[in-house]
Amino acid sequence: MSQRFFTQPSQDLVYLDANATTPVLPCIADVVSHTMQVCFGNPSSSHITGVQAKYLLEQTRNKARQVIGAQNGDILFTSGATEGIQTAVVSTLLANRHKATEHSVLLYGATEHKAVPNTLKHWNEVLGLGAKVLAIPVDKDGLLDSQFIAEHVGQALMICTMAVNNETGVYQDLGALEKVIRAHNPQVSWMVDCVQALGKQALALSDTTIDYAPFSGHKLYAPKGIGFLYIRENSPYTPFIAGGGQESGMRSGTENLPGIAGLYELFELLLDSKQAVFKPVCTLHQYRDQLISALEQTFGDITFNAPLASTVPTTLNFCVNSLTSKEVMDLFDAAGIRVSGGSACSSGASRSFVLDAMGVSDWQSENAIRMSFGPAASAADIALACERICALKPVLSNHCLIVSDAHQPEQEVCALGLTQLRHQGSCCWLFVADNNDAVIVDPIVELVPRLTRLVKQQQLRVKAVLETHRHQDKDSARSLLAQRLEVDASGELGWSHGEAIALGSHQLSRVTTPGHSSDSVSYLLSQNEHIEACFCGDLLVWGGLGSTQFDDASCEQMAQSLTLLSQLLEQNTVICPAHDYEQCFAMTWQAQCQASELLAALLQGEVDHEQFALRKDQLDQRQGEQSGALCGFSLAPVKASGAQLSAQQLQQLLHEHSDSTVVLDVREPYEHGATDIRSLFTLAPEQLINIPLSRLANALLTQQLDKSKHYVLICRTGNRSGQAISNLKALGFEHVYNLQGGLALV
């Protein structure tokens, strides 16, 4: 095989994302390869090679009928489920075009795959039907609202539901739905997405009034690019692809015979009662129970987002109640475990629309993990998955991500210094002195459980829980966290310590810095009379200034506060704002002044306070027009990117500059601990350091990085390392490189 293709990683892969796609079974791959090389004829050709190909095509069609229980109707081979959905929708809407009225509706389940509502909306607009596209609500268990269907299906041109949900595994009672649908509209076209039902549920489509049922091969061990569509006898049909008249004129284009051969082998397995590849449902339930046990043993506090009693056993949708989905997925990926955050086709979304429709909490929707395996999973596959999941518990406990059962907590890792904790665009800061004295600045409600666990597990002595002002965009977490940590919160914004708070060899002092709000303050962290960090709240955002659009804000007071800070801070003082809309993570006062044109103009005397206020007001108006960021707006220049290095180029750089080249892993410590980077690149101990993005500000504070060295940054995919490179470039680091594609492409 050409080296441009990826090879199996050295560690055994634990693949638990079967609802997204599956590997092709060896026996199916053999048949596909054989068809490509031997039975490669065009089914439309009249010679023997073509006749043989046609025979394979029709035999596969007959097998499909047996698998889905379709003695009648048509089986149409497609490129996949999405084409099948298009075909069903276009056929129905064209047939009902003349029936459309101002009251017509198109119904779909609120938890359907996005391919369904998007297709309905697209063709409704293109064909000019003007029907209302309505989502059928679901209850907390993900089951469709039968009453809603009864009230609206009478006006429906089409209704679309699904057999099994791809995110939660919830299955619908198709018999009960059929009764409701046909009782109120016997003629309406009904499409059922059966993609996730194939191989997991018994199907008898000819015994139903389902008009269309799309299927996909790659969700069940067949190749990508092949699927099929069941069309009920006498249901409307219009060819979606015209041309040479293949598939009896129903779908033109030379058939994907290798893919169809793959389906043939798949159907053979599904129909063979003696085969041992696909496991019985009882075995799949046992597999699920094993995975649940491993998850609960490792993570402890878990919420399952759908009732297990009404889901297929091959799908688990859950959230870890103290970890974000990104943290869980990054940890799993580092350990060679593949899962997803919801639907793979909707991975860009920050919430799950499926779980939102079910009415779960914000935390569940934002942090859902989908773990799915296929019905051909073996006992050894599941045992390895459970072993790998359970092996993560020491990593989690060592980094305070779960409650540890260690008897000597002092042996666990404690991140001394400055740590940034984030939720969406908000930042919370934890500083831990060398004697375990600690202070928390601008806590976030969503992070209270994590902060509480971290403080108690590491036996930190929290001297204060502080806010820099009363935040406009979020509820205050200060009182709640202080109560849980039994810290005095009686003072203004949590400050009740006189002039300073002692934190080991450090001191924390307070200065009033109004502008963003009238009560804004900044906290200055100093050691040996040097101010090392400034917790400035929303007076500053990285590369810009805080908003002055609130009722108690003042541009002139902001100018005075910034002038005061310029007199107190040093060039290398680390700036710690309450928001980070630019994914910047770490900034010094010097870099901040260079990045903010208006700040520089003020401090250099190019504008007075009145002129500053005028220009700041103009910037705020631009913020309102251009930015969704509530508390600040950055006008910093486009971020610089570092050179991209392949793994081979990295090795060459290490060879040529071994004394000055360092591999910098910017993943979180729990990810770093789950991957043997040193062996992967043959690194000496001094050639590898781990500074996660959450600790990049601390690296500035402690001067851990040397601008004369070459740093090759790595992470899982190259995204986080790319952000860190932009950050380091802004701080004056010239020799920084990104591992192209991250560890995923090594």
Task: List the predicted regions and their residue ranges.
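Short amphipathic alpha-helix with an adjacent loop that forms part of the alpha/beta core around
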Residues: 145-155, 450-458, 499-504, 652-656, ...
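Accessory terminal helices/loops
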Residues: 398-421, 425, 560-662, 668-670, ...
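Active-site metal-binding motif and surrounding structural segment of the metallo-beta-lactamase
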Residues: 446-492, 500
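Catalytic cysteine-centered active loop of the rhodanese-like fold, especially the PTP/DSP P-loop
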Residues: 468-469, 691-693, 699-746
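Short hydrophobic beta-strand that contains or immediately precedes a catalytic carboxylate
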Residues: 15-18, 77, 440-442, 513, ...
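Pyridoxal 5′-phosphate
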Residues: 1-415, 422-424, 478
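Active-site neighborhood of phospho(di)ester-bond hydrolases with catalytic His/Asp-centered motifs
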Residues: 79, 109, 193, 214-217, ...
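Catalytic core of the metallo-beta-lactamase
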Residues: 415-458, 495-588
